[in-house]
Amino acid sequence: MQPTPSQHPVGAQPLIARPATGIIDPNTGRPVGADDPFFLNVNRELSDKGFFVAATDDLITWARTGSLMWMTFGLACCAVEMMQLSMPRYDAERFGFAPRASPRQSDVMIVAGTLTNKMAPALRKVYDQMPEPRYVISMGSCANGGGYYHYSYSVVRGCDRIVPIDIYVPGCPPTAEALLYGVMLLQKKIRRTGTIER
């Protein structure tokens, strides 16, 4: 007769996984963020009361910063660097920044490249299809202010003439690290301003 999975042979110890410790900092040997004042306050409140008290706006803001869905509006060479952000080396999804194909499912639009006068109405149309609250990151010199083509008759001298911009990422083209820093700044801005007031 074979023992069932709930029965163990005499003297054998059941296999029990050790508790999760998180990501260990090799310099200190402690979990990353163990000294963070925010987490210390959360742990203190949970150990005192057994539950956590927060305002609804804080909860919505926390959820929104950790689940930003972005769509690309790639117009030129900066879009190649934007694609690199989703590759394994940078992996923007670990920050809760996941790509979407439809503007109706997106919170953030990244405008990357030279915006021409003919493309400006399309940019505005896509922006208007995004649900509120919506954010725009302008990536690269051309999107920020016309860049190399600033004096061309067919170029819009900055996307902020068409849609409101929340974060400007400079560079020609900006690196994936610069764009990732812009994403983190946007998350910080959302935490600071909230979503209900916007």
From Swiss-Prot:
GO molecular function list: 4 iron, 4 sulfur cluster binding; iron ion binding; NADH dehydrogenase (ubiquinone) activity; NADH:ubiquinone reductase (non-electrogenic) activity; quinone binding
PROSITE patterns, per database record: COMPLEX1_20K (PS01150)
Any one biological process term the GO annotation gives: electron transport coupled proton transport
Residues binding [4Fe-4S] cluster: 77-78, 142, 172
Enzyme class: translocase
Alphabetically ordered keywords of this record: 4Fe-4S, Cell inner membrane, Cell membrane, Iron, Iron-sulfur, Membrane, Metal-binding, NAD, Quinone, Translocase, Transport, Ubiquinone
Cellular component GO terms, alphabetical: plasma membrane; respiratory chain complex I
Co-factor: note: Binds 1 [4Fe-4S] cluster.
Cofactor annotation: [4Fe-4S] cluster
Topology relative to the membrane: Peripheral membrane protein
Reaction(s) this enzyme catalyzes, per UniProt: a quinone + NADH + 5 H(+)(in) = a quinol + NAD(+) + 4 H(+)(out)
Main location, first listed in the record: membrane
Localization (cell): Cell inner membrane
Record-listed E.C. numbers: 7.1.1.-
Pfam families: Oxidored_q6 (PF01058)
Task of the protein: NDH-1 shuttles electrons from NADH, via FMN and iron-sulfur (Fe-S) centers, to quinones in the respiratory chain. The immediate electron acceptor for the enzyme in this species is believed to be ubiquinone. Couples the redox reaction to proton translocation (for every two electrons transferred, four hydrogen ions are translocated across the cytoplasmic membrane), and thus conserves the redox energy in a proton gradient.
Quaternary structure and interacting proteins, as annotated: NDH-1 is composed of 14 different subunits. Subunits NuoB, C, D, E, F, and G constitute the peripheral sector of the complex.
Record-stated family: Belongs to the complex I 20 kDa subunit family.
Name the UniProt record assigns to this protein: NADH-quinone oxidoreductase subunit B 1
Species in which this protein is naturally found: Rhodopseudomonas palustris (strain TIE-1)
